[in-house]
């Protein structure tokens, strides 16, 4: 399995940080990884249909949250979880990142995005572990997805990948932007 993803968002969490390491460490074979990718794709399609998966549309909760949910579901599946457990893992992963804004410094998908990917991956692993241990989401997965969509629609535009709010407009964030504009990075 080649890791050709260049994404710092959606693909990075579920593919680079969760599934590829499983394969490289010998914890899953290629067929299992491919099945997990189908599970992740199905989860992503449902989220995209019912809500959104882009930071510009719904904040980082939509991008990293969706990726984390896809990874949680895929990991639960690869480890033998039931469909119900997959749903619980997805719901918990989304709930944990609900409301997360998208505020890229200098408008680039770098800061804080790269570090949020790690949080998304850890969240996915934790939620898969909880679901496999029998922890259930009190709110059904479809309702969690719908809620995330509503939160994203109500989120001010400044917090939806515009670099007009959040960390992007802190003094340090603006200083990075100015240095980039001068060609110092």
Can you say where each PLM-predicted feature lies in the sequence?
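Functionally critical mobile loop/hinge segments
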Residues: 68, 73-185
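Alpha-helical support elements that line or immediately flank enzyme active sites
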Residues: 16-28, 72-80
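Glycine/charged-rich beta-loop-alpha catalytic/anionic-binding loops adjacent to active sites
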Residues: 2, 47-57, 104-109
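Acidic-glycine-rich active-site phosphate/pyrophosphate-binding loop
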Residues: 31-51, 96-104
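Single conserved hydrophobic/aromatic residue that forms the stacking wall/gate
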Residues: 1-14
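Alpha-helix capping and helix-loop boundary segments enriched in small/acidic/polar residues
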Residues: 31, 55-63, 111-115, 139
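An acidic intrinsically disordered interaction segment
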Residues: 22-43, 88-92, 168, 172
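Glycine- and acidic-residue-rich phosphate-binding/metal-coordinating active-site segment common to enzymes
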Residues: 43, 49, 62-68
